[in-house]
Amino acid sequence: MKIGFLIKDLSSGGAERATVSLANYFALHSQDVEIITFNGSDSFYPLEELVSVHTADLGEIEQSASLKRLIGSVKRIFAIRKIVKQRNLDVLIGMSFAMTWYAVLATVFTRTKSVGTERSNPYRYKATKLNTFLRKLFYYFTDGYVFQTKRAAEFFGGKRSSRDIIIPNAIFNETVYTLSPPAERKKIICAVGRLIKLKRFDLLIDAFSQIADRIPGYMLFIFGEGEEKDDLENQIEYLGLKDRVILAGADPQAVKFVNYASVFVLSSDFEGMPNALLEALAMGVPCVSTRCEMGPDELIEDGISGILTDVGSSEQLAEAMLEIIENPDFAKKLSENGRKLLKTHSIENISRIWLDYLKTI
């Protein structure tokens, strides 16, 4: 089977990691795999040599002029279509909503099937009337759709029998499988994600500042890069926490550091299905997460495998972190229950479900 993935680039991020991991698995299981990107062929994550990467690179499409933007998008569709036909793909998977509509239009009147994916929160992400209309419109023109959660499928009116499927995120980071909970955890609180507004790292930093004096020696490490970096650095300096809050940048091996943390925190306003939280739970790191739409409450049973807090509440985040740090027995219970996800969300299991599904399209 000739399988294609369509994604903007192969930088660091959840969709990018999922793309690379699925592509690697498919290639190692006798499938021909191609990845089509918009911006370059370099991958942040290790990519098997068996996987080919092609670039439909037209540079940055001008956003200010509607006509130029439209012309640029049309050119890109034809660039993708050319690659699809040259490689004779059986299926092209759009690894986001934007990539899904490109996949649909690029495969019109070809033998290639288009499969869409919903990786964000369709109820909240750019939730304009036009965006909602386009999401649902292109959904019906795909040959299949993969959802990460039941809630996402409900947004589109439920599954269309065998054409659609709900497949939760796998633990795509292979390093996770090689790690065991440490005998003694370090005085570290960790978070991982792009430094963008919806991740609410400002909220986490504020929460940490509320309990910093009560947990001497503890430090907060945030792994990731993004547009909010300068604002977060200013916040850290304003709160007098330069020696205790570290913006550690993007690091593909951050998971090894997280494994030793006393607490992992996800502070987002909303998510699709957070890879970083899934990995931390599977490693047995005691976790705190906002009860944001779609994702955390499908991974965490509150008080059993982690702690869920109200979205936007720095006070609750602070209290939850403190509860874990001050109660070792409670932290151990969260660790043991969270680690059960290592089996249910293994890359072998989830990737096999993906491949079996694609063969039915």
Place the predicted regions along the sequence by residue.
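Conserved acidic donor-binding segment of nucleotide-sugar-dependent glycosyltransferases
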Residues: 55, 301-303, 307-314, 323-328, ...
